[in-house]
Amino acid sequence: MTRRLFILITIMLCLIPALLHSQEGYREVTAAGTHKLTLTVDSPRRLGGSDAPQVARETAEALQFDMVLAGPFTVTAPSAAAASAGIRPGEFDFAPWRGAGVDLLVKSGYTVTGNAMTMEFRLYNVTQGKEILAKRYTGRPGDVRRIAHTFSDDIMAALTGERGPFTGKIAFVSTRAGAKAIFLMDYDGHNVQQLTKNRSINLNPDFSPSGKEIIFTSYRQGNPDLFRRELFTGAEARISSYRGINATGAWSPDGKTIALTLSKDGNSEIYTISRDGKNPHRLTNTSAIEVSPAWSPDVRKIVFVSDRLGKPQIFIMNADGTGVRRLTTSGNYNVSPRWSPKGDRIVYSRQEGGFQIYAINPDGTNDTRLTSEGSNEHPRWSPDGRFITFSSTRGGGEGIYVMRADGSGQTRVSGGKGRDSHPTWSPRW
């Protein structure tokens, strides 16, 4: 399946079956007189057990947030005239939903018995009166948002051929607890938890490819050292503690290697180390400052920042340090590059008064500005390459935002006191 770019579903209703049953995965289809598909999330129903209005509310809220961000749909509120108690085929009439202009319908129900919960979801093609997808999940009432996000991922798989990233987490840096600490939250801002509690400065979190670990830089012992943390146990290990900077660590996509910035030999240079911090290998060797390495998805190249030409610019080199070439030719201050998981785009920040986020092809073409409001930094891709998370000062303070890969749908997801920055999106959980 080679065509899994972000889907802009603007499609004639008569083409829905072709979309859903394509053997080639996602297809981008446009035609004169077409319209964006209308999707409605009906109110979740109690199928048995105890009444749990919070489960119903959070289910609908999470599904609607996911589908609005997804972008291919016009998401509408459920029609009171069309609403009915049934969620399974034969338990409700499609005609009122057609009359309300609905193309795709999500129905769901729950059964809560004590601390056990079963949730059932259905996705329907209203135009044809057919069921597209049916799923059942078990868990606890506290799992409701995770389960709803899981079904959103399944919706994207059914309609595009690739699962969504909505079960992912975002790790970020925040001052909400005082000193800069690493926090973790659902991608939509819910279920926030503080990871580091060392009362020191902690920066630049990055997820392992498995999503089970992060690396980050901490000043807890005075020097900016690189640490690795297991997310499920909380166990931490210092893996790079050379004198000077041990920072901007980035896991390779195969999980075997970490690229980072070290200043142990003088100025800041790009190195690689093994996942346990051994076998340091220097990749750059200039008098310039070189920082912020990030891997290509095939592990063959590294994009990084260097001021070897006087101002910070983005460069690309082979993973062994050879074949260095300049990527950005516009702007005088370009930083924080990150390669798309699909390999087709590199996102970065450019200083233009404040900072704005750009995306560029790896060959240097199609350099496109994605943000304009406030100062925007630290862009990172979702695991499917359809979305980007970043920090922004718009609206006062500094918060974490998400947007589609083309810059549309910019939405704040972090709240509360303090300044939030340096987000990174986990692999699917």
Swiss-Prot record:
Domain of life: Bacteria
Region Disordered, annotated ranges: 362-383, 407-429
Coiled-coil boundaries: none
InterPro entries, alphabetized: 6-blade_b-propeller_TolB-like, PD40, Tol-Pal_TolB, TolB_N
Record-linked NCBIfam families: propeller_TolB
Keywords assigned: Cell cycle, Cell division, Periplasm, Signal
Signal peptide: 1-22
GO cellular component, one term: periplasmic space
Family matches, as HAMAP family: TolB
Subunit description: The Tol-Pal system is composed of five core proteins: the inner membrane proteins TolA, TolQ and TolR, the periplasmic protein TolB and the outer membrane protein Pal. They form a network linking the inner and outer membranes and the peptidoglycan layer.
GO biological process per UniProt: cell division; protein import
Bias kind Polar residues: ranges: 363-374
Protein name per UniProt: Tol-Pal system protein TolB
Family in the record: Belongs to the TolB family.
Function of the protein: Part of the Tol-Pal system, which plays a role in outer membrane invagination during cell division and is important for maintaining outer membrane integrity.
Organism listed in the record: Geobacter metallireducens (strain ATCC 53774 / DSM 7210 / GS-15)
Gene3D superfamilies according to UniProt: TolB, C-terminal domain (2.120.10.30), TolB, N-terminal domain (3.40.50.10070), Tricorn protease N-terminal domain (2.120.10.60)
Pfam families with a match to the protein in the record: PD40, TolB_N
Localization per record: Periplasm
Principal place of residence: periplasm
